[in-house]
Amino acid sequence: MKKYAQTAHLLILFFTLATLRSQAQNADNFETFARQHDSIFFSLYLKKDTQNYRLLLQDWERRYAQLDAATRKKYAAERADAHYNLACTYALCGQKTPALDHLGRAIEAGYTNYSHLIADPDLEIIRGEPRFAALAEPIRAVGDYLFILRHAAAYNVADARPWPAFRYDPAEKPELKALRDTYRLDSVAGSGNDLSQALNVLHWVHEMVPHDGDHGNPAQHNAQAMIEACRGGKRGLNCRGLATVLNECYLSLGFASRLVTCLPKDSLGIDPDCHVINVVFVPSLDKWIWVDPTYDTWVMNEKGELLGIAEVRERIILDQPLLINPAANWNHRYTPDKAEYLYRYMAKNLYILQCPVDSAWDLETPAAGKTMRYVQLLPLDYFKQEPAVREFSDSASGATYIFYNTNDPVNFWKRP
């Protein structure tokens, strides 16, 4: 009976492979092919079926090898994950050597999640092996985000490379006044103190427009155009779009605020992910504070005092207490876990900080003859300090982009 069942299972797998291969070749649709394989990989992992997982992965690899370079790069992470999960399957079956073999192939394919690697219970049987340590150590420098950030603590306040002073559009600029009047932002902010007003506006933007990280933003990158494009739940905005809307709302109410792009070190050039949030200057606190419209989030110390980005970064590095507001959420579908949000995701993305020189209405809508300027705060640890100024033009729009590098956090976070 067991033998018959195994034979039947192999026949089913054979016909499944034939069907998937035909789809991939005839329709040239590797995405569908890969997605279906991934589902079967997971099923075989649950069954601890190393033999058929290995056969299926060999088939996946053959198809992957036929792709052009750009498509192979697109699916490199899936390849790494497939080998990693086969390593887990072997480890759960007590087979150390093939588990280590496929872990090595996963790392060669680009697997870099060091924190998961050292904590994954599936790999417990091989974690004490010398070969495991040899495989894991090199990816610590690219996948252990706390380790990376702690090596990037140092700046240089004496950095004399010149860059323009930050500028903030006045609230009475006609377009900002129109934004304020259209959405009655004075009423949204309320009659409380400046901190409560800033947090009320953060909450309003979060409630007004959902986050959608899977699509680009509308062509017009200003608050009124983007809110209108999303009206009635037609669409959402990615983190940059939400931060742009919040920034212009703050400017329209007379707050100095900035868009802040938080970037990883990405020494391998394989991580396109970043996160965009805001800082708003609260006069009564005499400081910038962290506000994230994607998660309706601000960050505090153990006393409940609101913190700015520089303070949060320093506290992560020094392992000092941090809190996020209890009402933080993503589209009201889940509450972000503090450890995941701050100590993994933001630890990764607080390596480089980038702000526009001009905090202005419609800042990032590209147009012929338009120049967009940015300042990047780099830690001394970063491997690309030069050139001090980089300029390029976008041939499609005719817009020009200028990036200034600095190691000076004092001037970067200068009060408005």
Region roles according to the model:
Residues 244-319:
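Hydrophobic/aromatic-rich core segments of domains that either
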Residues 26-28, 63-76:
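Flexible helix-coil transition and linker loops at the boundaries of alpha-helical arrays
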Residues 75-82, 113-135:
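TPR/TPR-like alpha-solenoid helical repeat scaffolds
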Residues 318-416:
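Low-complexity, Gly/Ser/Thr/Pro-rich intrinsically disordered linker/tail segments
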